[in-house]
């Protein structure tokens, strides 16, 4: 049934053109079948890098370029690529992958098909290595509403403190950095044994740097919930999938490399400004997540 299945990789681009070029080339060089396409969505990059991306791949028939007229964020930007992949390219599978990642596995797509046929998962997440070849750490658990309310309170306090530090830094007054900065807390999942990452897991919150949407997903949904700009998309996706009785899966049979946060870093010349931006978006998205959990009667675990 899936001997001639097709897949499109949706790569959301913003500013960092070399990372996007490297990501797309890694797909083209390592995922060989003719029924593989790449859809690059330029999220209205202000530095003109979208033109560089378009011109770089203008002669590559498997690469499509979609410029957006405003920065729509992660969910809506990816949805533009998903919609093109589904309606124009008729792709069976869609892989939304960060532009600061590399696909280094030449049987990546064939393994995706095998995993899907074995599990009927709506969304598949790969094992993720960082540039030093360590595992990408992330929390696979949907927490309780009370947990996220506490996080919301913490984020608000953090924004207040970061704004103060930013003002003082502009005045030339250095304040020692808080090692426990609330906007940059490590997940409690970080303490998990590394064997976790070499084991298949069903119905976990997946990492958003690479999410593979399968045919059964598109029987119920057209893409991400459009209500967030940045952050918490993975938890909301998990809730949506669970609400219709579908499963997702983390599989170590497929893997990518993640270079982390290149696009977000490109926005700022000041670390405080970056942290304020990140934390404000976490506040907005955590509010959306709490509303989503309440509307779906999801209590977390």
State where each predicted segment sits.
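A short, conserved alpha-helix in the catalytic core of glycosyltransferases
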Residues: 196-199, 204-223, 227-254
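A conserved acidic beta->alpha catalytic loop
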Residues: 26, 42-53, 70
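A recurrent flexible, glycine/aromatic-enriched loop bordering the glycosyltransferase active site
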Residues: 162-184, 190-213
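Short, acidic, metal-binding catalytic loop of nucleotide-sugar glycosyltransferases
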Residues: 25-35
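Active-site-adjacent helix/loop segment of glycosyltransferases
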Residues: 235-301
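Conserved donor NDP-sugar-binding/catalytic core segment of glycosyltransferases
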Residues: 102-140
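Short beta-strand-to-loop acidic/aromatic patch adjacent to the donor-nucleotide binding site
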Residues: 90-102
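Glycine-rich, basic loop-to-helix element that forms the pyrophosphate-binding segment
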Residues: 68-88
């Amino acid at each position: 049934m899936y001997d001639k299945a097709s897949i499109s990789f949706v790569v959301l681009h913003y500013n960092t053109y070399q990372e996007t070029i490297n990501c797309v080339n890694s797909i083209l060089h390592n995922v060989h079948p003719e029924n593989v396409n790449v859809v690059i969505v330029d999220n209205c990059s202000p530095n003109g890098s979208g033109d560089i991306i378009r011109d770089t791949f203008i002669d590559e028939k498997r690469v499509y370029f979609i410029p957006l007229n405003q920065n729509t964020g992660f969910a809506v930007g990816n949805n533009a690529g998903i919609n093109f992949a589904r309606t124009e390219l008729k792709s069976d599978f869609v892989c939304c992958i960060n532009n600061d990642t590399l696909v280094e596995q030449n049987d990546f797509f064939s393994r995706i098909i095998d995993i899907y046929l074995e599990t009927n998962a709506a969304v598949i997440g790969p094992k993720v290595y960082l540039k030093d070849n360590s595992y990408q750490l992330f929390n696979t658990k949907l927490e309780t509403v009370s947990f996220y309310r506490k996080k919301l309170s913490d984020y608000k306090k953090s924004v207040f403190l970061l704004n103060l530090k930013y003002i003082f830094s502009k005045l030339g007054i250095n304040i020692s950095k808080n090692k426990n900065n609330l906007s940059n807390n490590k997940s409690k999942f970080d303490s998990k044994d590394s064997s976790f990452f070499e084991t298949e897991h069903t119905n976990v919150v997946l990492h958003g740097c690479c999410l593979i949407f399968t045919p059964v997903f598109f029987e119920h949904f057209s893409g991400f919930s459009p209500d967030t700009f940045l952050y918490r998309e993975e938890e909301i996706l998990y809730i949506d999938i669970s609400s219709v009785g579908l499963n997702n899966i983390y599989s170590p049979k497929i893997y990518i490399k993640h270079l982390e946060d290149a696009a977000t870093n490109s926005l700022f010349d000041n670390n405080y400004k970056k942290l304020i931006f990140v934390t404000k978006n976490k506040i907005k998205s955590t509010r959306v997540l709490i509303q989503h959990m309440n509307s779906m009667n999801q209590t977390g675990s």
